[in-house]
Amino acid sequence: LKDYVDDDGEGSEYGLYGIPDVPDDEKTPVTIVTGFLGAGKTTLVNYILKEQREMKIAVIENEFGAVSIDTDLVSENVQQNEDIITMENGCVCCTVRGDLLRTLIDFLDKRKTFDCILLETTGIADPSPIVETFNQDLDVKVNYRVDSVLCMVDAKNIVRQLNRKPTEARAVNEAAQQLAFADTVVINKTDLVTPEELTFVKDRIHSVNAFAKVMQTEKVRVVLGLCWD
């Protein structure tokens, strides 16, 4: 952040100690997508990439080999640079092999080439340390903002997942953690449950998180304006 500090080492008009006071609308928005394996996270990411053609989206995945982007989104002359793949519509996808913070820092030079970031987590990931990553480094903090934490749930299996006994190290299980941390919940595969079961699912979700916006869909086809600003 040396560009934000005066020559005499004093803080500039950007803020105390030279830390820039960057408005949120000038930071790259990040949507974190959580949810158990099979809930539809990757399908949602692919759907957004296909439907939001006017936006340049960077996708960060934990396991690119296991949860791949649809091949029809990748151009024939695909550009590859280590774990970064550039798609035909200008979007990019990269894999986190280790440190998410390092990946975000590496993206700083590229961030002005895309409009937003979709960060897809593994199925058992606790979202709280992922969100905290955006506060651990000053460069990351002034260049990115967590816009939304979106939790995908499988209508058929979420109640069973919520009923699982947590490990000794956790007060609640992974499904409850993901729901509790979300500001948007998408109930997927609603065609696989009865109306009564769906009502029960919604009640269970609200018992964990009464403040999240809850949407429902059959095959991840959602109104993008409601979950993707």
Regions from the language model: what does each represent?
Residues K2-D6, E174-D229:
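C-terminal accessory "lid"/substrate-recognition subdomains
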